[in-house]
A protein has these predicted regions:
Chain A
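Bacterial Sec signal peptide processing site at the extreme N-terminus
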Residues: 11-34
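The tetratricopeptide repeat
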Residues: 66-67, 102
Length: 112, 223
């Protein structure tokens, strides 16, 4: 009994360690892979990422690098430039390294 | 020519052979360039795929940002990068790899560029299990073109074996799983495994980036 309890505890600790990283990436990897190969899934992928970003914002956690920009690009490729620019601005605000690239994208989109 | 001379020739010949083998395996012995360059951001460009499996390249591309982001680097958003490169007229990964690094780096203001090439990716169906063998090469280059880090990984992956259950149910499960694996090999676990072997290798540790907790300690004793 005691042994099984400590095993449970250990398993809990281990799984806790496994999920702890610098960031919460949500379903980014599997969803982007689906986005490339299951065109019917695009809407679900976009919605899932936006919900993930909302959850991060609600928790006050910084989203993983690039995720805000990826949401912007999903919208851009759906033809929604306004939503794209909004997300590109958020990526630029969160990550200084992204600013030149985001500025290029925003300038191009606002010129058109 | 005495015995000694013959022995010397043999040794030289052998070392040539050995070094000849080593050349095909791209390796960086020293991290001096890396430490000097101290990149803060990594631009992962589309993956060159020499295999016929079209999902191989996207599975590598989609699993790299997390791997390197968790190392503490700013990783440029791979799908946004891909889209921007396509707007610029660079639609094939090989075309992107042919662009001088300085040009790519300045387009994104990136400190470093990661080039990945899949040399082979084959799934073999043997009775009740499918084994996938991959051979992937990774090269991290500074904005000025200096090679900072490189590795090449060959590995095999099979669906998990089932140790519990009767022989028949195990066999049935394996057949079903193998059929699934054949229709759609388990791309993401395999590429995660390959990436992890490359970037969390204790013998060739990949240095931490500026957002990693150990960054300052790591660079404290570096020139």
């Amino acid at each position: 009994m005691r042994a099984s309890l400590s095993i449970l505890l250990l398993a809990g600790l281990l799984s806790g360690c496994a999920t702890q990283g610098l960031y919460d990436w949500g379903d980014y990897e599997a969803d982007l892979f689906d986005y490339y190969h299951q065109p019917g899934d695009k809407e679900r992928v976009i919605e899932n990422l936006v919900q993930h970003l909302d959850r991060m914002a609600a928790k006050g956690r910084k989203p993983a690098p690039g995720l805000l920009a990826e949401a912007g690009t999903y919208y851009l490729l759906e033809g929604d430039a306004e939503a794209a620019v909004d997300f590109y601005r958020q990526e630029a605000a969160a990550w200084p390294e992204s600013r030149p690239m985001m500025a290029t994208l925003i300038t191009n989109l606002e010129a058109n | 020519m005495g015995h000694r001379a013959i022995a010397a020739v043999v040794v030289i010949g052998f070392s040539l052979l050995v070094s000849g083998c080593a050349v095909t395996q791209v390796q960086v012995d020293t991290l001096a360039e890396f430490h000097q360059s101290r990149p803060k951001s990594i631009l992962i460009v589309p993956v060159v795929n020499r295999s016929i499996d079209i999902k191989a390249s996207t599975s590598v591309l989609t699993t790299l940002p997390r791997q390197l982001g968790e190392k503490g680097y700013y990783v440029f958003p791979v799908n946004t990068v891909k889209a921007l490169l396509e707007f610029e007229g660079l639609s094939s990964p090989q075309e992107v790899h042919n662009v001088p690094p300085a040009e790519l780096a300045s387009l994104f203001h990136a400190d470093s560029i990661l080039y990945v090439t899949i040399h082979s990716w084959t799934s073999k169906y043997i009775i009740v299990s499918t084994t996938t063998e991959v051979d992937i090469e990774y090269r991290l280059v500074a904005a000025d073109g200096a090679l900072l880090w490189a590795d090449r990984e060959k590995l095999k992956h099979s669906p998990d074996s089932h140790e519990n259950g009767t022989v028949l149910s195990t066999l049935l499960l394996a057949v079903v799983e193998s059929a699934i694996e054949r229709a759609d090999p388990n791309y993401l676990p395999l590429t995660r495994q390959a990436n992890a072997k490359v970037f969390w290798n204790v013998n060739q540790p990949f240095p931490p980036g500026p957002y990693a907790p150990g960054y300052f300690e790591y660079y404290q004793d570096k020139p």
